[in-house]
Amino acid sequence: MLKASLKSIASYIPEKILSNTDLEKMVDTTDEWIARRTGIKERRIANENENTSDLGTKAALKAIERANLKPEDIDAILVATLSPDYFTMPSTACKIASNLGLVNISAFDISAACSGFIYLLEQAKALVESGLKKNVLIIGAEKTSSIMDYSDRSICILFGDGAGAGVVSLDNENYILDVHTASNGNYGDLLMTQRSQKSSLCQTLSMQMKGNEVFKIAVNTLSNDVVEILAKNNILAQEIDLFIPHQANLRIIKAVQEKLNLSDEKCVITVQKYGNTSAASIPMAMNDAYEEGRLKKGNLILLDAFGGGFTWGSALLKFGGENF
């Protein structure tokens, strides 16, 4: 029976590095404090003339090629981002479609913050398994630096820029086993992008977070969510080949890893070099594992993510891409 499969993974990493040492010169913080509290050592920052759609396009082109397809084979583009090119329209997905030379295809954005890539997998799975679409391009892309207040030391130390992409198509062997997504809007004010009204035509956006509250809820929610999706599918944690979580904070990742009793060899961690890239973090981490030879065709992968909204989700899949 044919089912939805993640047939490729790719990423685009901006060249500019913003290290903790650099941040010491910008706000009242230290490299030691940031690393101890978050696990982050550096993050990437896009050029001023690079938009979120540009980052996403570069990752998308690699993902399409790795799926042995051409851009014209894509019949839907889904983008998860909290830092779109434009405040309301056009969507970043439409901009990427234009960059790829594609018209008359479905293209839309999903707003699920750091959980965005899990939501993309769920939607792409539904589209291809229903027969509505054949090859769905999913992209997590973020230029968080465009909405970052670099005078706010509580949050500017956390985030970076980047993009990751993959293609979802049908396969009869290595497919997406299950995806679970959920939300609780009662906690929306703990993590948000705040709009301040300067005039009727001029607005500024900045990200705000109540970190301690978010941390506690994230650890409890993710720990329960991954246990539930494994139990639902009668899979033991030890059967997982790779655990690839959203890269928000090393302490959150380690808490869930400990809950599952997984070895370091089975846990993919990239937060130290990219920071939190929101919806892009899971596909970026997957691509690192793929290019390092850790992620191989047929591997059983567990993904999880938690983000503003609150939103969260997890996914179980057997990777369908060819080995790097």
Swiss-Prot record:
What are the start and end residues of every segment in region (ACP-binding)? 247-251
Concerning SUPFAM superfamilies, the annotation shows: Thiolase-like
Transmembrane feature ranges: none
Its pathway is: Lipid metabolism; fatty acid biosynthesis
Q: Where in the cell is it found?
A: Cytoplasm
GO terms for MF: 3-oxoacyl-[acyl-carrier-protein] synthase activity; beta-ketoacyl-acyl-carrier-protein synthase III activity
- The EC designation for this entry is 2.3.1.180
Instruction: Name any Gene Ontology BP term.
Output: secondary metabolite biosynthetic process
Q: Which residues form the active site?
A: 114, 246, 276
| Keywords annotated in UniProt | Acyltransferase, Cytoplasm, Fatty acid biosynthesis, Fatty acid metabolism, Lipid biosynthesis, Lipid metabolism, Multifunctional enzyme, Transferase
CDD domains listed in its UniProt record: KAS_III (cd00830)
Main enzyme class: transferase
Q: Which Pfam families match?
A: ACP_syn_III, ACP_syn_III_C
Catalytic activity entry: malonyl-[ACP] + acetyl-CoA + H(+) = 3-oxobutanoyl-[ACP] + CO2 + CoA
Q: Which GO terms describe its cellular component?
A: cytoplasm
- Stated role: Catalyzes the condensation reaction of fatty acid synthesis by the addition to an acyl acceptor of two carbons from malonyl-ACP. Catalyzes the first condensation reaction which initiates fatty acid synthesis and may therefore play a role in governing the total rate of fatty acid production. Possesses both acetoacetyl-ACP synthase and acetyl transacylase activities. Its substrate specificity determines the biosynthesis of branched-chain and/or straight-chain of fatty acids.
Quote the PANTHER family the UniProt record gives. Answer: 3-OXOACYL-[ACYL-CARRIER-PROTEIN] SYNTHASE 3, BETA-KETOACYL-[ACYL-CARRIER-PROTEIN] SYNTHASE III
Report quaternary structure and partners. Homodimer.
UniProt domain comment: The last Arg residue of the ACP-binding site is essential for the weak association between ACP/AcpP and FabH.
Family, per entry: Belongs to the thiolase-like superfamily. FabH family.
Q: What is this protein called?
A: Beta-ketoacyl-[acyl-carrier-protein] synthase III
Give the originating organism.
Answer: Campylobacter jejuni subsp. doylei (strain ATCC BAA-1458 / RM4099 / 269.97)
